[in-house]
């Protein structure tokens, strides 16, 4: 008899924790198109505008380990509540940031907001893994992660239909060129005030939603996980023992590196779709529609992938999806025009299962007493999203590389990342075969 993904006694908790995946998906994907928006309205280079992503994903790198130590000391529920509080504070800081019109203030606001996301991801991912049988843990996480693109699509929809169409700085002439740089300083100041207020509003709204979720979770009793029960019984590892165990687990160790590469690839692909489309003369609001299609493919891939995992080993499927992503990335690099853009969008289908699969594979054979810190390093791997986009932005600023549009050639960076994921899927699958 097939074991259920989630038993009835954990179902309400599973639903509640799964809602958090949508919350951080919203924050991720309303922020991606803001890179291009800030680049125009604040008159920044692509490299400097991508500091939005550096601040956003740098927050994960800064707070993942402190979050794990906090959860280790207290509980998963405490970590969730603190994460939601930090999320709300960062969102509400957009109010003074828009008033002062300081790009650095927006970066700080996002940095604090992602302190909260680091707590939520460090907590929610291993919590979902623990809510049922170990054999179904990776499939269970893939199912929960399928609701992350729901939040992402919501964020993209808000950006596409509410934020980007209202940006006066994106108005263009008959030739499709942005006219904002040609305006007087007085006109620019007026438009900047308007546009930053438009950018601010969805963050304030999501901050209010986060506060409501915080109250609901605060009033809900959560089940104790295996690691929390062992802690209560005095069965714990020291931090040094945990670090040693993790380091000597090759699949875990390589999984952290694969996750760094995956997040870097994901953020580069989704952030610079707009610049790729802009290079084809497409305005930001229309370009964002391609991001929505990409995320819809990603959402579909999560559900399809979760179903296929009943018949195909997760490790093998990860390798196959890595190959598919690499082929599409080559299309985005080598093919100019709309066909190249379609190839770029199609990458998202193959990225769909990567994050939860790498996460689940890496933690599958980690002792439950080590999962807090193990999860933290996998969340900390999101730093890949901070490090690589500025490098891609610098490539895009070159305009042409080897006679090709620089925006096309910049996708060599995510291609390298996908090759790493193919190798990880293959190596983890071969190790599983050797054990059997």
Task: Put a short name on every predicted segment.
Residues 136-168, 376-389:
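Glycine-rich segments within core transmembrane alpha-helices of 12-TM secondary carriers
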Residues 119-133, 352-368:
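Intracellular juxtamembrane helix-capping segments at the cytosolic ends
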